[in-house]
């Protein structure tokens, strides 16, 4: 094997040293055997040397608790946690960037509903903290701290921790309650209060004496008045009655007035609202792990620098934009034209017009030459750097255009708001369609620019060499120049680095050009002469044939008869 290799090298070296033709220098660009297809403005399939995937399709199987602070509600949703349901006491004072609600969360206290559920859920989630401030309420001649066997803490009957169930006094009285609380602080207060709906009139009078009862809650700018809806309902956790919870925000300088003759579930204080906090909520069954990521979805966290993702449209934090496409590739290299493999030892002397060079690995553009000293290949780093400088930062610019920090959470609506839900889904789908189209257009535009830039740098390099050589060489039309003077490796290097002196070789090149052209026709002139010669020969042959026929007819040797 060693002897065969040495013999091959000797043959290769000898063939180069025995080269007697004119020196040739060719310009080419880097290529690979298998490029990557990208989309441009004008073509859906353009092969480039290198490209970068922009759409993230992989996600972690867990939620990352850093740098965003996550609070796991476990069996408690955010509403039950705010009300103080049994089993949710551990969430008192909790603070979060993202509150994780689990699909398995359950109610553990008296059956209730929230007429404006989504709004209250959003207010609590955005607040980012359960900061409950207890207050003293002076309720007169009523019994406080009502409880229920449905709402046990351990083996003891209880109730929602942050609420006070008012019932008639032991003296069978429930007089009109009218209580005012002023907000003299510097922050907005959130009061959560409720109205009890008994299942029968008997239950109503047993609890509140007055039938019907009434609850009115007012501020300077709003008023909510509720009359209990007495009636039988399906049994839930041993109860057919219900509680409806409402909420009121009291701004600094405002006040809240509670007016009731029965059925009020009174607050024990208020939640401090933080207008500067921008937190949110995520409903998912994915567990919290120990990783690090700024982006969370309902399928898991995403750790990526890509500007787009097609994992989930529900995303929170500093996340890539959701697009429908599974792949968007950004060209980071030039157009790829794979090298032909059937040219022999120096068959790849062909220039960039025919195809690329797979051996040019240290630059995007370069030279190949053949002269009496042999053959060689060298990269042109100046042109390569010029192209790279224009392409570098392209991904960063693309990310800047799409890096708006936002969160998209899944909306929840009551059944009566089905039309609103349909409209919201339509708006979200339209927004995603628009973003997907914009992303595809933006990437195609950048790819078109990349290919145009790399092609332009190739042409600039070609023009630079052509202006240097001028009449000292002939452009072969395929990216190569035939040089009409002796050009050793030092001369070739001067052409590559731009220091070639045309005047030094001018006389020799002119003499050699005239000598060669005096005895040699280019392939184009040969073709013209061959066609002219063929045409004249055909014409003379036809003329001789016609002349012979006419002569034979005159002599009577040929008789022509025309029959009709």
UniProtKB/Swiss-Prot annotation:
Ranges in the topological domain labelled Cytoplasmic: 549-564
GO BP terms: clathrin-dependent endocytosis of virus by host cell; fusion of virus membrane with host endosome membrane; fusion of virus membrane with host plasma membrane; viral budding from plasma membrane; virion attachment to host cell
Glycosylated residues (UniProt): 18, 34, 178, 310, 497
Membrane topology (Extracellular): 23-527
Signal peptide start-end: 1-16
Subcellular location: Virion membrane; Host apical cell membrane
Principal subcellular localization: virion
A Pfam family matched in the record: Hemagglutinin
One annotated GO molecular function: host cell surface receptor binding
Recorded GO CC terms: host cell plasma membrane; membrane; viral envelope; virion membrane
Cleavage, annotated site positions: 343-344
Modification comment: Palmitoylated. In natural infection, inactive HA is matured into HA1 and HA2 outside the cell by one or more trypsin-like, arginine-specific endoprotease secreted by the bronchial epithelial cells. One identified protease that may be involved in this process is secreted in lungs by club cells.
Transmembrane domains' residue ranges: 528-548
UniProt KW keywords: Clathrin- and caveolin-independent endocytosis of virus by host, Clathrin-mediated endocytosis of virus by host, Disulfide bond, Fusion of virus membrane with host endosomal membrane, Fusion of virus membrane with host membrane, Glycoprotein, Hemagglutinin, Host cell membrane, Host membrane, Host-virus interaction, Lipoprotein, Membrane, Palmitate, Signal, Transmembrane, Transmembrane helix, Viral attachment to host cell, Viral envelope protein, Viral penetration into host cytoplasm, Virion, Virus endocytosis by host, Virus entry into host cell
InterPro entries from the UniProt entry: Capsid_hemagglutn, Hemagglutn_HA1_a/b_dom_sf, Hemagglutn_influenz_A, Hemagglutn_influenz_A/B
Lipidation (S-palmitoyl cysteine): 553, 560, 563
Function: Binds to sialic acid-containing receptors on the cell surface, bringing about the attachment of the virus particle to the cell. This attachment induces virion internalization of about two third of the virus particles through clathrin-dependent endocytosis and about one third through a clathrin- and caveolin-independent pathway. Plays a major role in the determination of host range restriction and virulence. Class I viral fusion protein.
Annotated family: Belongs to the influenza viruses hemagglutinin family.
Note: Major glycoprotein, comprises over 80% of the envelope proteins present in virus particle. The extent of infection into host organism is determined by HA. Influenza viruses bud from the apical surface of polarized epithelial cells (e.g. bronchial epithelial cells) into lumen of lungs and are therefore usually pneumotropic. The reason is that HA is cleaved by tryptase clara which is restricted to lungs. However, HAs of H5 and H7 pantropic avian viruses subtypes can be cleaved by furin and subtilisin-type enzymes, allowing the virus to grow in other organs than lungs.
Subunit structure: Homotrimer of disulfide-linked HA1-HA2.
Name by which UniProt lists this protein: Hemagglutinin
